[in-house]
Amino acid sequence: MASPRVFPLSCVVQQYAWGKVGSKSEVACLLASSDPLAQISEDKPYAELWMGTHPRGDAKILDNRISQKTLGQWIAENPDCLGSKVKNTFNGKLPFLFKVLSVDTALSIQAHPNKELAEKLHLQAPEHYPDANHKPEMAIALTSFQGLCGFRPVEEIVTFMKKVPEFQLLIGDDATAQLKESVGGDTEAMASALRNCFSHLMKSEKKVVVEQLNLLVKRISQQVFDGNNMEDIYGKLLLQLHQQHPGDIGCFAIYFLNLLTLKPGEAMFLDANVPHAYLKGDCVECMACSDNTVRAGLTPKFIDVPTLCEMLNYTPSPSNNRLFAPAQSQDDPYLSIYDPPVPDFTVMKMEVPSSVTEYKVSTLDSASILLMVQGTVTAIIPSAHAEIPLYRGGVLFIAANESVLLKITVPKDLLIFRACCLL
């Protein structure tokens, strides 16, 4: 009998310190709903759910008819399951890693190298850059989700320099003057001035950074205590970041980078060399299968300042330009498609109302991973004459060209995300 080509997965949870704790975490709630044996500790963080074949989180196969223990092992022995184009383009490997993140405290400000730079960095310093792949990524909000993303318009940065003297002091008079002069000029002049300012900030002496940050925190705290609103300089966020990462250069990055608050279903796409940081909330994330990160702050980890300042994309743009809108499917009223300008991954969102009794998952020429965020269904697999019950938090691997029919077993709306590779 042929090996099943659609099967449920048990996925790896990462308990990084920045994750939401216990049942406040969407990751923990998905885990608890899908696995009756899961024990959720109310004092432990549940930061990420990894759905894929990454060596640090290869999903286990929940089908005793399959001899391989993990998805990575199974794909290695059944590479045709990827679909012919995906198999040939990505050397028989699943090209994406699919995740759920539950963020309580800010992650480091970071950027990911493009493929060319990733190869160079990996050769030079494999201890810091573990592979030669690029790492574009996309976050889709499940709850209100706050993040920093890309350089804000230069006019806004100049305004912060006027209002936050501690910030301007670290950048210095010459770099500040160059940035002010670039306003309204050509894009290249603005990007060059921005690079100069950001490099000055990142290369500031630690002692001076700590002094200026303490002065700013003291000033904002006093104003807030006196009943003044300090939101024109993001007072609340600065105090929050300083509490999480005292004395960290990254606290000043909020004056350089766009602050986005995504509503559920809204997305941001983070291409190579775009500085970003996730601050708070729950999201679905999809990325190319890589671990390469160049950090810029809000972290005790290694910061490669020269590489960072050299590689970043310094093109400023307003925050609403950073939102990535999905396309509505022409054939399926319940399907939205988030298809970023990279070959490695696409994410589909299915919102099916409770009035529908069954829903056909579209057949693709790509392996895919499906996550049940809301709802209870029975997945019917015609090719295997099999039925698989799926609850909230359930994860299903679907090989290329397999059809799946979802029968809704509890009359509640469905929210499903599916990662795939549409070449």
From Swiss-Prot:
Pathway(s) served: Nucleotide-sugar biosynthesis; GDP-alpha-D-mannose biosynthesis; alpha-D-mannose 1-phosphate from D-fructose 6-phosphate: step 1/2
Residues recorded with modification N-acetylalanine: 2
Binding residues annotated for Zn(2+), in chain numbering: 110, 112, 137, 276
Top EC class for this record: isomerase
Catalysed reaction equations from the record: D-mannose 6-phosphate = D-fructose 6-phosphate
Gene3D superfamilies given in the database record: Jelly Rolls, Phosphomannose Isomerase, domain 2
GO cellular component terms given for this protein: cytosol
Pfam families, A to Z: PMI_typeI_C (PF01238), PMI_typeI_cat (PF20511), PMI_typeI_hel (PF20512)
Sections of the chain in a coiled coil: none
Cofactor: Zn(2+)
Active-site residues (renumbered): 295
Subcellular location: Cytoplasm
Superkingdom, taxonomy of origin: Eukaryota
Function as written in the Swiss-Prot or TrEMBL entry: Isomerase that catalyzes the interconversion of fructose-6-P and mannose-6-P and has a critical role in the supply of D-mannose derivatives required for many eukaryotic glycosylation reactions.
Cofactor notes: Binds 1 zinc ion per subunit.
Record carries keyword Transmembrane helix: no
Alphabetical UniProt keywords: Acetylation, Cytoplasm, Isomerase, Metal-binding, Phosphoprotein, Zinc
CDD domains for this protein: cupin_PMI_type_I_N (cd07011)
Protein name: Mannose-6-phosphate isomerase
Any GO MF annotation of the entry: zinc ion binding
Annotated EC: 5.3.1.8
Stored SUPFAM superfamilies: RmlC-like cupins
Location of Phosphoserine modifications: 102, 108
Family assignment from sequence similarity: Belongs to the mannose-6-phosphate isomerase type 1 family.
